[in-house]
């Protein structure tokens, strides 16, 4: 294995700027843009609808998407769609709250991940293929979790309240590494309905695709915003962050809650759920003063 591949965590069909010229990546079959003929929408967070647009396509830049997300607020709603379960909160964090969280995040060692990302994991080790869970390295959630969960409840207790995280993962994206995360759906065996992503340092775009309807929707996530994907958005749409939508450094603070089988009363509560909930309520101290 070459030094470039040793410097990143990519394998299989995934690659980043550090390994894109290696023999492994050169041998990969070029995948055609499957979204080239999809109908494109831009999300209007004010009216909470997705507006059809001919100004964007499957390769649109971050800057073009930002411009369109602003201008779409004054256009007709003809042809618009609602994506049930999609919630975008601008300025979820204040500058001082973000600064305190970042100071704690950067005291923790980062691990290499795939597609040019680095990560910090708080949660169980999950074997999705064999449906097994290990908790030996799960020692709790970082101390700033309580501040985030309280703010979520205060903002909208119905949509965001009573959130019991089973996992918190900080994902670092860097423009120079061409960091990305491919279009995907999160596992549905262990992870529940609401997926949370908070944008630190810089904003980006969450790209959504509904392959059954051939729809593509861009959701501009500004700096310090919170995105929740649940219900239809969670189960009928794929989501991803494309490399050309990253500027500078961005950290996505992500949270996942338990699937129903792992919650109290579920089939896997006694086997896994109870212990995961107990561990998820422990806080790992990262600073001398609390957020």
Swiss-Prot record:
CC cofactor note: Binds 1 Fe(2+) ion per subunit.
Location in the cell: Nucleus
InterPro entries assigned to the protein according to its UniProt record, in alphabetical order: AlkB-like_sf, ALKBH4
Disruption phenotype: Mutants lay fewer eggs.
Catalyses which reaction(s): an N(6)-methyl-2'-deoxyadenosine in DNA + 2-oxoglutarate + O2 = a 2'-deoxyadenosine in DNA + formaldehyde + succinate + CO2
Protein keywords: Dioxygenase, Iron, Metal-binding, Nucleus, Oxidoreductase
Keyword Iron listed: yes
Domain Fe2OG dioxygenase: 85-256
Binding site for 2-oxoglutarate: 171-173
SUPFAM superfamilies for this protein: Clavaminate synthase-like
Obligatory cofactor(s): Fe(2+)
Binding positions for Fe cation per the UniProt entry: 184, 186, 239
Gene Ontology annotations of biological process type: actomyosin structure organization; demethylation; DNA replication; meiotic chromosome condensation; positive regulation of chromosome organization; positive regulation of double-strand break repair; positive regulation of egg-laying behavior; positive regulation of fertilization
Keyword Oxidoreductase: yes
GO molecular function annotation: 2-oxoglutarate-dependent dioxygenase activity; demethylase activity; DNA N6-methyladenine demethylase activity; metal ion binding
Quaternary structure note: Interacts with top-2; the interaction is required for localization of top-2 to DNA. Also interacts with mtss-1, his-24, ule-3, C18B2.3, pgl-1, ceh-93, mcm-4 and F37C4.5.
Family assignment from sequence similarity: Belongs to the alkB family.
Record function comment: Dioxygenase that specifically demethylates DNA methylated on the 6th position of adenine (N(6)-methyladenosine) DNA. N(6)-methyladenosine (m6A) DNA is involved in epigenetic transgenerational inheritance. Plays an essential role in DNA replication and repair in the germline during meiosis. Binds to components of the DNA replication machinery such as top-2, and directs their localization to DNA to control DNA replication.
Protein name per Swiss-Prot or TrEMBL: DNA N6-methyl adenine demethylase
Record organism: Caenorhabditis elegans
